[in-house]
């Protein structure tokens, strides 16, 4: 879970600030104090889903290739605990969540099944009440029209398709083959 103030450099995260300041307290305490400074300003929540069904050879993302649903669920269970901890943090510090934007990236968040995705969204909604944008990156090879409608029903307002190139030769070279017809079908009403 990565949270940063909207409009600030996204590399400016509390843990990095804590490391630079060399406090004589635990990083958690420093992170908490730094976060309290920003937690009522509009915030952006980024959730990294590090799983993909297939490796694209150009990819430098932190990811794991797997179709093991138990492994993905194990990760998701821990991510949900992190979200619960954040919600509890707001409550214990008598604060209201100022999360205004949410972005799921990866890997590919579309590698989550619908139940997993809905559970994740429900946990987020338990602490984020005024979301202006909810974005999800998807691998167009892993979704269909029904999936896109499902994402919308969960509150997603923007979908980014991972289209790297339309040239079949380039697609083959990067191990990301997706015919233009596939994209056209997803974008056509």
Q: Model-found features: residue ranges?
A:
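Generic recognition of cysteine residues
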Residues: 12, 39, 59-61, 121
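Local cysteine-cluster metal-coordination motifs and their immediate loop/turn environment
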Residues: 47-63
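Flexible, acidic/Gly-rich N-terminal and inter-domain linker regions that tether
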Residues: 1-46, 53-54, 93-96
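Conserved non-cysteine loop/helix-boundary elements of the Radical SAM core domain that shape
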Residues: 63-89, 99-189
């Amino acid at each position: 879970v990565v949270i940063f103030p909207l409009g600030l450099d996204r590399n400016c995260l509390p843990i990095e600030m804590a490391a630079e300041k060399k406090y004589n307290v635990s990083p958690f305490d420093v992170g908490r104090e730094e976060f309290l400074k920003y937690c009522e300003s509009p915030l952006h929540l980024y959730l990294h889903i590090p799983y993909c069904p297939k490796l694209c050879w150009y990819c430098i993302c932190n990811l794991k290739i797997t179709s093991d649903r138990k492994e993905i669920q194990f990760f998701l269970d821990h991510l949900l605990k992190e979200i619960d901890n954040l919600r509890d943090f707001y409550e214990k510090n008598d604060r209201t969540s100022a999360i205004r934007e949410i972005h799921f990236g990866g890997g590919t968040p579309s590698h989550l099944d619908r139940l997993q995705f809905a559970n994740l969204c429900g946990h987020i909604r338990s602490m984020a009440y005024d979301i202006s944008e909810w974005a999800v990156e998807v691998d167009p090879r892993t979704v269909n029209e029904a999936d896109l409608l499902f994402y919308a029903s969960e509150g997603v307002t923007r979908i980014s398709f991972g289209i790297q190139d339309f040239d079949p030769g380039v697609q083959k070279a990067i191990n990301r083959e997706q015919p233009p017809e596939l994209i056209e079908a997803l974008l056509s009403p």
